[in-house]
From Swiss-Prot:
Enzyme class per UniProt: transferase
PANTHER family: S-METHYL-5'-THIOADENOSINE PHOSPHORYLASE
Phylogenetic classification of the source organism: Archaea, Methanobacteriati, Methanobacteriota, Methanomada group, Methanobacteria
Protein name: Probable S-methyl-5'-thioinosine phosphorylase
GO CC terms in record: cytosol
Recorded GO MF terms: S-methyl-5-thioadenosine phosphorylase activity
SUPFAM superfamilies, sorted: Purine and uridine phosphorylases
Site entry: Important for substrate specificity: E157, I211
The protein's role, per its UniProt record: Catalyzes the reversible phosphorylation of S-methyl-5'-thioinosine (MTI) to hypoxanthine and 5-methylthioribose-1-phosphate. Involved in the breakdown of S-methyl-5'-thioadenosine (MTA), a major by-product of polyamine biosynthesis. Catabolism of (MTA) occurs via deamination to MTI and phosphorolysis to hypoxanthine.
Pathway: Purine metabolism; purine nucleoside salvage
Keyword entries, A-Z: Glycosyltransferase, Purine salvage, Transferase
Length: 280
């Protein structure tokens, strides 16, 4: 099953397939927003609105652990996340799409691991799944590669912070991409992001940053974003051939790998999916 974590502007994604069910899940970390499970191109897809349907959860208050855990419980093995971002480069402007290959984490107060009671050091040498990245960047006009900088929010960044991020090699800056990527890796799920640039970052932009421009760009480009995700779902194979699915090998100091996410073995069995493309 494929999971889609929808950010600003694409809450209609669930209407593009054949709806099977819809509802919230109770996890050890709390209740999730309403998740829609539907069929698209022969694949089962679970869509979860990151901020809740009314966009009433600010980035630093999103229950990232509950969202990722719930997707794992549903049997999701591959996650496509969408993120609205500001650009740190003049060559990448509002309306452009970026598929990052790495990240810088400047979040501070968010629960960022499932392993508070076990000593687990998951490898992040390749932070985003190569297979999903390839599927997303196959669409025309998508920038393949970049460094995603995640800040705590909910405020926008200062000019000094933006200069620091640029010096460190950042490409885009947002508030929602982490700890999602890490949590997915800790549960051995494939994860990649498609970022839509909504504005230039502070001091690069000639004007004051507002949330209005974020929503304006998302509204203008949401159909293109949905098309990119749709094409990626068509291209993604059910069989995994990437390191993501073995991320916990060698990660547990006490070598109790089989106990790290006890309870998923019966729930998350390999999915048998149709291989034909039957369209929305």
């Amino acid at each position: 099953m494929i999971g889609i974590i929808g950010g600003t502007g694409i809450y209609e994604m669930a209407e593009y397939g054949r709806l099977e069910r819809r509802g919230s899940l109770i996890t050890p970390y709390g209740k999730t927003p309403e998740i829609s499970v539907f069929k698209l191109h022969g694949r089962r897809v679970a869509f979860i609105p990151r901020h809740s349907p009314g966009h009433d959860k600010p980035p630093h208050m999103v229950n990232y652990r509950a969202n990722i855990w719930a997707l794992k419980e549903l049997g999701v093995r591959q996650i496509i996340a969408t993120n609205a971002v500001g650009s740190l480069k003049r060559s990448i402007g509002p309306g452009d799409f970026v598929v990052p290959h790495d990240f810088l984490d400047f979040t501070r107060s968010r629960p960022s691991t499932f392993y508070d009671e076990k000593t687990v050091h998951v490898d992040m040498t390749e932070p985003y799944c190569r297979n999903i990245r390839s599927a997303l960047s196959g669409s025309s006009g998508v920038v393949d590669g970049g460094v995603y900088v995640c800040t705590e929010g909910p405020r926008f960044e200062t000019p000094a912070e933006i200069r620091m991020f640029q010096t460190l090699g950042g490409t885009v800056v947002g508030m929602t991409g982490l700890p999602e990527a890490v949590l997915a890796r800790e549960l051995e799920m494939c994860y990649a992001s498609i970022c839509l640039v909504s504005n230039y970052a502070a001091s690069i932009s000639p004007s004051k940053l507002t949330i209005d421009e974020v929503f304006e760009i998302m509204d203008e480009k949401k159909n293109d974003l949905i098309d990119i995700i749709d094409a990626a779902i068509r291209d993604l194979k059910t069989e995994q051939s990437c390191p993501c699915q073995h991320a916990l090998r060698g990660a547990d100091v006490n070598n109790h790998e089989e106990e790290l996410y006890e309870g998923f073995n019966d729930i998350c069995k390999p999915e048998k999916e149709e291989q034909h493309h039957d369209g929305p």
